[in-house]
């Protein structure tokens, strides 16, 4: 029983003493740790999950952002796909002229007549 009472405080204090045991995640290109509060000599560079700060040692230059290398072009010759992708879009323009006087005269002279369409039934 005494051994259990000694082991229990050790298990509770162990995550406080060993940072890697507490499960702190790495951040900022694996040079920082996610913590609730940064220690002395550390600067906040980003935010982690669960509202934690990414604490990076301030004595190193961590201004660089991880970069990716550009994708090399494997073939510089043009193919069918290139021709399809370089199709230029055109827009057709239509002019609409209003002949209001002519429409009014034709409606007055003839009257508005509507005819029903012929319906053919097949048996």
From Swiss-Prot:
Signal sequence bounds: 1-19
Disulfide cross-links: 27-54, 34-48, 38-55
Residue ranges the record assigns to the propeptide: 65-123
Compartment list: Secreted
Pfam families for this protein: Defensin_beta_2
Organism field: Pongo pygmaeus (Bornean orangutan)
Gene that specifies this protein: DEFB118
UniProt name for this protein: Defensin beta 118
A GO cellular component entry from the record: extracellular region
Ranges in coiled-coil conformation: none
């Amino acid at each position: 029983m005494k051994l259990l009472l000694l082991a229990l405080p050790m298990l509770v204090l162990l995550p406080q003493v060993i940072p890697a045991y507490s499960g702190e995640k790495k951040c900022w290109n694996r040079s920082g740790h996610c913590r609730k509060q940064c220690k002395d000599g550390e600067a906040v560079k980003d935010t982690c999950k669960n509202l934690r700060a990414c604490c990076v040692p301030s004595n190193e230059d961590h201004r660089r952002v991880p970069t990716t290398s550009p994708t090399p072009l494997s073939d510089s010759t043009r193919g069918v796909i290139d021709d399809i992708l370089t199709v230029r879009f055109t827009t057709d323009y239509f002019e609409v002229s209003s002949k209001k006087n002519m429409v009014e005269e034709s409606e007055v002279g003839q009257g508005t007549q509507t005819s029903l369409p012929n319906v053919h039934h097949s048996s």
